[in-house]
């Protein structure tokens, strides 16, 4: 995903309070709501870790969170 596209999607998810799933280039993943948007990073309230900053440059996959269906 290009940077401009990612910023638009992030802004949409932030504004609409959509729960997101983020995979990072360093192998971590996060599920939660975006609390804050800054110039180079966001703060997500991860379901397990609580408030966590994530650099935009470290985001590999950004998508709407979906519950597992068994």
Identify the role of each PLM range.
Residues 1-29, 39, 45-70:
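Short glycine-rich, low-complexity segments
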Residues 30-34:
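Structural detector for short beta-strands of small beta-barrel domains
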């Amino acid at each position: 995903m290009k940077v401009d596209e990612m910023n638009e999607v992030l802004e949409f998810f932030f504004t609409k309070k959509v729960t997101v799933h983020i995979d990072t280039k360093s192998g971590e993943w996060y599920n939660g709501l975006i609390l804050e948007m800054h110039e180079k990073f966001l703060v997500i309230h991860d379901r397990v870790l609580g408030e966590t900053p994530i650099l935009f440059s470290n985001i590999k996959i950004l998508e709407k969170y979906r519950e597992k269906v068994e």
